[in-house]
Regions:
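Aromatic-lined carbohydrate-recognition surfaces of secreted/lumenal glycan-active proteins
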Residues: 105, 110-123, 183-187, 215-266, ...
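Extracellular glycoside hydrolase catalytic/binding regions
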Residues: 211-212, 217-224, 237-306, 328-343
Length: 397
């Protein structure tokens, strides 16, 4: 157990404290496909109770990992990660999303619905794909991209109809469910595969409008983020919109505004201009994934937390932390690695919380980190920080 005065002095402050609960490939929940409704519910409640006991006040729950649904939808089929077969409803029937929101709220925690905007088929060789899956109904919206080990099918971000469809999916969720937030992770255009360009030449030819291809790709992502920001607020102006990007926007060598890092970047490789979205106020919070250790040679945690602190433009910035890396190398065998990273989120200006990848990392209390949270850092429960620019939820204090 690591004790620090920062834990104690921070006790009374509002802070966002959350875990990502991943459903893709059954990473966190359900533990395997085809569990009974009762087993699924029991597992989810056990996860929630663990996170609550650790002091979390929110969960970021993946409800649409691959153009599929953990809720009844007229737009996309039931997820294979629930039942083992895409399109098959849970039996006995229940609405997992409704159940999860209710259980989360019962414990005084926020529920952020996490979606992958563009991933449609996780693995084209072995994923279950239902007849009513969008990739079967509208094949012209999709492209395949990957390497010898795995090919994934994606919505083509350059096709306007694909953007509109994803917007309809989000609108439907916000309209029908009492979510506190809508959350995207780092997958916009996919991470580049060596020697292979993303196959969007036809869409570029049709919709490129004379822009350079990189610029056009960025404009496609900008356009959907702006559209979603508006759509969410039209439906429920109190619902938060957050994005958890890869931890580096740009390197200093490419842009004087960039960080002193030597890494892949959001802007140049994933075509995601996070800073623009923050500056424009299209999103309410950002969770940069700072999954490197303090002192990392190419992407130092300290360098990056300071950089993001200076580039949040008045929106909330929570730091994505990596308990899954426990014991993966010498730095992550150090029991103080995660506690020191938490301390830095509290001593660095403009940082309002932490989000942990992922839920299952806490099951075995790696390096005693659960104890550190319960007995020190999160000893006192606190509310999530207020966003004064948002409308108040009807009936809230």
């Amino acid at each position: 157990m690591i004790i620090s005065s920062v834990g104690a002095t921070y006790a009374q402050k509002a802070e966002f404290r959350a875990a990502w609960i991943a459903t893709v490939e059954n990473i966190d929940w359900p533990s395997k496909r085809g569990l009974s409704t009762e087993e699924q519910k029991r597992e989810f409640i056990a996860l929630l109770d663990m996170h609550r006991k650790n002091g979390m006040n929110a969960v970021v729950m993946q409800i649409r990992p691959a153009a599929d649904a953990f809720y009844p939808s007229e737009l996309e089929p039931w997820s294979e990660y629930l039942t083992g077969k895409q399109g098959q409803a849970p039996s006995p029937y229940y609405d997992p999303l409704q159940f999860m929101i209710e259980e989360t709220h019962k414990r005084g925690m926020e529920f952020h619905a996490w979606l992958n905007p563009y991933r449609a088929v996780f693995n084209t060789a072995r994923s279950s794909v239902a007849p009513n899956h969008p990739s079967r109904l509208y094949p012209e919206w999709f492209v395949d991209y990957g390497d010898a080990s795995k090919t994934t099918r994606y919505f083509n971000p350059g096709v306007p109809e694909a953007q509109d469809f994803v917007t309809r999916v989000i609108r439907d969720i916000v309209k029908r469910y009492d979510v506190d937030g809508i959350h995207f992770d780092d997958y916009f255009y996919p991470y580049p595969v060596a020697g292979k360009d993303f196959p969007d030449a036809k869409a570029y030819q049709r919709y490129g409008n004379g822009m350079a291809k990189d610029q056009w790709r960025r404009s496609n992502v900008d356009s959907i983020i702006a559209k979603l920001g508006r759509t969410i607020k039209q439906e429920k102006p109190w619902v938060k919109f957050g994005i958890s990007p890869f931890g580096v926007w740009r390197n200093k060598t490419e842009d004087p505004e960039g960080s002193d890092t030597k890494a892949l970047t959001n802007y140049d490789h994933l075509y995601a201009d996070i800073l623009l979205w923050l500056r424009k106020g299209w999103i309410d919070y950002v969770v940069p994934q700072l999954y490197w250790e303090i002192g990392h040679e190419r992407a130092d945690y300290l360098t990056l937390i300071n950089w993001w602190s200076e580039h949040s433009y008045g929106r909330h910035c929570y730091i994505g932390l990596a308990p899954y890396r426990a014991n993966s190398n010498a730095a992550w065998k150090d029991k103080t690695q995660l506690p020191r990273q938490i301390q830095l989120t509290r001593t660095t200006p403009n940082i309002q919380g932490q989000v942990y990848f992922s839920s299952k990392s806490f099951l075995n209390n790696p390096n005693g980190w659960n104890d550190s949270l319960q007995n020190n850092y999160y000893r006192q429960q606190v509310p999530t920080p207020a966003m004064p620019w948002l409308a108040k939820k009807p009936g809230s204090q």
